[in-house]
Curated annotation (Swiss-Prot):
Origin superkingdom: Bacteria
Region called Head domain (RuvB-H), residue ranges: 258-336
Principal location: cytoplasm
Family listed: Belongs to the RuvB family.
Pfam families, A to Z: AAA_lid_4, RuvB_C, RuvB_N
Annotated spans, Large ATPase domain (RuvB-L): 4-184
Organism field: Legionella pneumophila (strain Lens)
Protein name: Holliday junction branch migration complex subunit RuvB
Xref: SMART domains: AAA (SM00382)
Cited PANTHER family: HOLLIDAY JUNCTION BRANCH MIGRATION COMPLEX SUBUNIT RUVB, PTHR42848
């Protein structure tokens, strides 16, 4: 099973991109949540605009689905400049990055998603570009090869990554502004759901928006996806208005519970509790019990369960916590 196959996946899905762009906030005043990041960026942007300078290079990191691309677009909009978007895996050759950099206008934003996946060769080209706005590339091969130095207009590089630890130190050190995005509170997600519903023309009661937010795993991308599915349900089974009852019925049909767990999350936890007495149990045994690959469990299923305190990863194996027992209505004593 792939992460993108799950309804509560925080990964981007191509078919949703157009709709996501339609409901994406364009300014910091519309940007809900991440209050510290928002207030800091407002100051940095205002200062840069006063000086008519490019904004310092920005690194945005955090789990998928929290709005790194959205924030990059907001920064460009607030600066009143164009944004050029690309991603680390797409930039394969020196000529690729050279073509992008030489087409930037003064103070423009270059946004590189998944920046941790840039090759060392591309990073080496970026260093002088970021520091001195100079492009140093080799033309030709062998004895005929020669170095060409080009002046670049001042620009801002915004890098986004879900895995900041994979960035090389030289690249990381060249970002003057580093922002970490955190999971959203239920209150913030409720505002996001209500705003998205309004933009999509979906009548939504405040309690209905909150019910969707509660099951969205702290992630706006999931909240907007669930909102669209609840909208479908309410239009077919109800009068098109998303109430708390309608949201609950829709999400129960979709098998997303009050903690945002789907069928696979519950299957994993129940396997640890019922088949292995709560653990500790090895990952290979869990994989065999639920019929999933070891890598899928480690990369897709476990992280959220561990983060929410339902599962512990120990040297002896995985252990279901008392919180997991309570979730399924079991006595925590059974764990011992």
């Amino acid at each position: 099973m792939l992460e993108s196959d799950r309804l509560i996946s925080s990964q981007s899905i191509v078919s949703e991109d157009a709709m996501d762009r339609a409901i994406r906030p364009l300014s910091l005043s519309e940007y809900v949540g991440q209050d510290s990041v928002s207030s800091q960026m407002q100051i940095f942007i205002n200062a840069a605009r006063k000086r008519n300078d490019p904004l310092d290079h920005v690194l945005i990191f955090g789990p998928p689905g929290l709005g790194k691309t959205t924030l990059a677009n907001i920064i460009a909009h607030e600066m009143g400049v164009n944004i050029r978007q690309t991603s680390g895996p797409v930039i394969e050759r020196a000529g690729d990055i050279a073509a992008i950099l030489t087409n930037l206008q003064q103070n423009d934003v270059l946004f590189i998603d998944e920046i941790h996946r840039l090759s060392p060769v591309i990073e080496e080209i970026l260093y002088p570009a970021m520091e001195d706005y100079k492009l140093d590339i080799m033309i030709g091969e062998g004895p005929a090869a020669r170095s060409i130095k080009l002046e670049l207009p001042p620009f801002t590089l915004i890098g986004a990554t879900t895995r900041a630890g994979l960035l090389t130190s030289p690249l990381r050190d060249r970002f003057g502004i580093v922002q970490r995005l955190e999971y959203y509170s239920v209150d913030s997600l409720t505002q996001i759901v209500a705003r998205s519903a309004h933009l999509l023309g979906v009548p939504t009661k405040p309690e209905g928006a909150r019910e969707v937010a509660l099951r969205s795993r702290g992630t706006p991308r999931i909240a907007n996806r669930l909102l669209r599915r609840v909208r479908d349900y309410s239009e077919v089974k109800g009068n098109g208005i998303i109430t708390v009852d309608m949201a609950q019925q829709a999400l129960e049909m979709l098998e997303v519970d009050q903690h945002g767990f789907d069928l696979m999350d519950r299957k994993l936890l129940l396997a640890v509790i019922e088949h292995f007495n709560g653990g500790p149990v090895g990952i290979d045994s869990i994989a065999a019990a639920i019929g999933e690959e070891k890598g899928t469990i480690e990369d897709v299923l476990e992280p959220f369960l561990i983060q929410q305190g339902f599962l512990m990863r120990t040297p002896r194996g995985r252990i279901a916590t008392s919180k997991a027992y309570q979730h399924f209505g079991f006595s925590a004593i059974e764990q011992e």
